[in-house]
């Protein structure tokens, strides 16, 4: 039975019923299902879930032990609770008819290209073997990549991929060199990074629509953004050493902007603007040194 639903995640600690499946099917907000509290799903549980995934392919399943995917051929989005849940050499993945999204904590995934003909989204976390990092270049259909606290040494291995989304959490790779090659990138998010000092690669990402830099400790100044004509969202959150936001002046008025950090607040130039609501009231009160053209921006007329 479904024990609880938290946000977009459903947890179950006992056998699933037909009523559970009906509830899950009707809940359009569910995005992830996983066993909880040490419960080991039965074949009957997995067969019920397989019926659900046939109808709701956007829902992800978190595997908790090897062998579970054998009964889930319709599953398209899967992650593992701990390393090893997909069997030796990721062999359990062969049971899936179409693998679209995969979350790995496995340090060695050199076998992944064998199962990745349809893989569009990949999330990696933790330590990676050197050979595993190198095999990323073979995932030619990949569109979205998430690196959370990994040990990837360089972005060179993804330079030829047609990625549209990239998320980097942590300090590795310790240089952004190679990111300038990702010309198809539309969304970039970097968080909790204290190693990158040079963000000039941003000027080459001409198709970028969303830029989010959070807790980037060594970001001191922005590069010119005027060549990024597709930008619609810029967030510079808690970048405490960022001293100036002058490049934001060149952004169009249909671009949502949030920029804050210790030095910006001290200088009275922290900034928040939405095309729908205009400049935030807290900004008008606290950021007395904002450039006049930023402060004067108005919301779009409805």
What do these predicted ranges mean?
Residues 3-25, 29-71, 76-90, 98-111, ...:
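Concave beta-strand-loop units of leucine-rich repeat
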């Amino acid at each position: 039975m479904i024990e609880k639903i938290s946000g977009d995640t459903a947890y179950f600690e006992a056998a699933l019923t037909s009523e559970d499946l009906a509830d899950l099917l009707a809940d359009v907000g569910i995005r992830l299902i996983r066993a909880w509290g040490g419960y080991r799903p039965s074949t009957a549980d997995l067969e019920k879930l397989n019926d659900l995934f046939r109808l709701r392919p956007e829902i992800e399943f978190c595997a908790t032990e090897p062998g579970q995917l054998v009964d889930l051929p319709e599953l398209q989005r899967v992650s593992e609770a701990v390393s090893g849940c997909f069997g030796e050499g990721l062999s359990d993945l062969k049971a899936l008819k179409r693998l679209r999204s995969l979350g790995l904590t496995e340090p060695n995934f050199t076998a992944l290209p064998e199962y990745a003909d349809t893989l569009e989204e990949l999330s990696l976390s933790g330590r990676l073997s050197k050979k595993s990092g190198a095999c990323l270049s073979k995932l030619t259909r990949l569109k979205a990549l998430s690196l959370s606290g990994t040990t990837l040494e360089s972005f060179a291995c993804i330079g030829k991929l047609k990625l549209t989304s990239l998320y980097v959490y942590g300090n590795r790779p310790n240089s952004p060199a190679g990111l300038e090659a990702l010309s198809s990138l539309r969304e970039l998010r970097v968080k909790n990074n204290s190693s990158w000092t040079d963000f000039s690669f941003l000027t080459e990402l001409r198709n970028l629509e969303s830029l989010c830099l959070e807790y980037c400790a060594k970001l001191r100044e922005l590069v010119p953004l005027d060549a990024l004509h597709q930008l619609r969202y810029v967030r510079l959150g808690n970048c405490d050493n960022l001293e100036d936001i002058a490049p934001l002046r060149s952004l169009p008025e249909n671009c949502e902007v949030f920029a804050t950090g210790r030095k910006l607040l001290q200088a009275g130039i922290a900034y928040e603007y939405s095309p729908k609501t205009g400049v935030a009231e807290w900004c008008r009160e606290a950021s007395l040194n904002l450039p006049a053209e930023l402060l004067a921006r108005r919301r779009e007329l409805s």
